[in-house]
Design a protein with these regions (language model features):
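Short, hydrophobic/aromatic-rich segments at coil-to-beta transitions
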Residues: 29-36, 61-67, 96-101, 133-136
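Beta-turn initiation residues at beta-strand->coil junctions
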Residues: 39-40, 69-70, 102-105, 138-142
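A charged, solvent-exposed segment within the mature domains of Sec-exported extracytoplasmic proteins
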Residues: 120-158
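N-terminal glycine/threonine-rich, aromatic-flanked beta-hairpin/loop signature
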Residues: 46-93, 137-141
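Bacterial N-terminal signal peptides
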Residues: 11-22
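N-terminal helix-cap/turn-to-beta initiation motif at the start of protein domains
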Residues: 25-36, 55-59, 127, 156-157
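N-terminal secretory signal peptides that target proteins for export/translocation
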Residues: 1-7
Length: 158
């Protein structure tokens, strides 16, 4: 092997790294910004919770205020129940763990009409992935614990 080959290989690897890093958005903070989320199914595998959450860094390191809108969508087994809720939350990151504690701000929509208008706040304990593009862990409320997944809400460039 000639001395130039290792340099060429290193240059190729460096070039690929630069191209890939340019394709990924830069996040000044591990958590701040917009994320989408969903949970595993529940209620006889008929319902699921999903939503969009925005984290804003506070003056306290690794602490965030957050707001989100969640939707609980159920199928026929649960009378096609649909609940859309606005929630407020605080989040704290310790290492890779992120704990999100929420409170229901307002129930925005319930279908079918006449269904119960109560909703339990969606709380989460998740772990930030090493690429800072995803968080996985648990959703919990007073009735259940579910798997939860968060991913960055990044618009694709077309």
């Amino acid at each position: 092997m000639t001395p130039r080959r290792p340099l060429r290989r290193l240059a190729a690897i460096l070039g690929c790294t630069i191209v890939l890093s340019a394709a990924m958005p830069a996040f000044a903070d591990d958590v701040a910004g917009d994320w989408l989320f969903d949970t595993s199914k529940f209620a006889d595998n008929d319902c699921q919770i999903s939503g969009r959450i925005t984290f804003t860094q506070t003056s306290v390191k690794n602490t965030y205020n957050c707001v989100f809108e969640s939707e609980q969508i159920c199928g026929k087994l649960n009378f096609d129940l649909y609940i859309r809720v606005q929630q407020n939350c605080t989040a704290q990151r310790i290492g890779k763990q992120v704990a999100i504690k929420s409170s229901v701000g307002k129930i925005l929509e319930v279908r079918p009409a006449g269904q119960s208008t109560s909703y339990l706040a969606d709380n989460f304990i998740v772990q930030l992935s090493s690429n800072k593009q995803e968080m996985n862990g648990s959703h919990y409320d007073e009735q259940r614990q579910l798997k939860a997944r968060f991913w960055r809400d990044v618009e694709l460039i077309g």
